[in-house]
Amino acid sequence: MDDRRPLLRLAKKNREISGIWKTIWPDWLSRVAKGASMSQSERAEFEPIPPFQGDVRYILLLTLVATLGGLLFGYDTAVIAGAIDYMVEKFSLSATMKGWVTSNILLGCAAGAILAGPLSDLLGRRRLLLITAVLFAVSAIGTAIPANLTQFVFFRILGGLAVGAAALVAPIYVAEIAPAHLRGRLVSLQQIAIISGMVVVAVVNWFIALQGDHTWNVHWGWRWMFGSETLPAILFLFCLGLVPESPRWLIKQGRTDEALKVLNRTSGSARAAWEIADIQRTIAEETGRIDELLRPGYRKILIIAIILAILQQVTGINAIIYYTPTIFRSSGSTDIMALAWTILTQAVNLTFTLVAIAVVDRLGRRPLLLLTSVAMAVSLTLLGWAFHAKMSSTWVGIFVQCYLASFAIGMGPVVWVVLAEIFPTRTRG
């Protein structure tokens, strides 16, 4: 008797294939028929991605110009560290007023960050960065020559507006000007630029303090410290006049021809049209609403994000950054040595931020946050004990550097990475 089981299995397989083909065939025909009527942005989803042929040096130049905003962010926030003790003597500030003069910039930062999003959509990324450059320059001049403390506070808050806006808009501009395969590395330059600004201003403050004795610094030195920011602010303003607007913003405004000119240079002519179609499709799919974050599925993520952001700011980093010279003067250092310690502290901050960028993907976000949080707690405890036991400034310096290194490799940069990753794409903005 013949074994017909192989033939039966083959017949069954043919019926299955036939059934699948009957299901696919009408859909495929409709796609082909629709192809002629597809928009450019719809075709982009199915077409192969053309090769990248952009000018990398030009992209890097645009990135460096934008990240000057980050450098000014770091410069403007950290300049107070070298000046505040001289201002205490100049204006006879109480401890409460010293804290207010040091921290009032944060009011401007908050307002600037809130306003920057809507304003950058309305005016454009480049135009808003131009405004921040002007604010940085005006703030630098105003804080250098105030007639009284009220004027100083006003111009300091004005600088805070620029800091908050630059913190948001500069990385957005870089993200929108850079091709996808370079975007992550180029956006990470913003964090490096911020800390580089802190290093630069620490060196500038130290150099200015060397130009005279203590009395000269009380009357004039701190003014030059604030006024020195005018130079990088004017450089930022000049360079922004040479860069184009973000192609994404241009496309959103219907100025596709202008966007094409930019993309021809940043992505290459072969890829520019595909980039425009892809951006148009992405803009059309941006349907996320802020109230979605309050839904049960997102609520836990939102709470975690808020707690992480708060913890990042209340772990003592701002006290260390703003009062580094004060900390070392309190431990027995001279004015000049306290400012020299500040340079070392910011250099450690920059070095370990670079380490964090190198290891965050290999070691993972959670282990880095947990381990460095423990290290920060231990370092702060030892720092407090050093003052209690009246240890030398060398021990104080060691514990401060340990704290900064722990923050710079963990809580500082990694929190921003986590916040960028935990939200679904549709609600991320």
Located regions from the model:
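Leucine-biased recognition of intrinsically disordered, low-complexity hydrophobic segments
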Residues: 7-10, 29
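Catalytic cores and adjacent flexible loops of soluble metabolic enzymes
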Residues: 13
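Tryptophan (W) side chains
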Residues: 21, 25-28
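Alpha-helical transmembrane bundle of multi-pass membrane proteins
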Residues: 32, 39-264, 281-429
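Short helix/loop segments within enzyme catalytic domains
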Residues: 266-268
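Short, well-structured alpha-helical segments
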Residues: 272-281
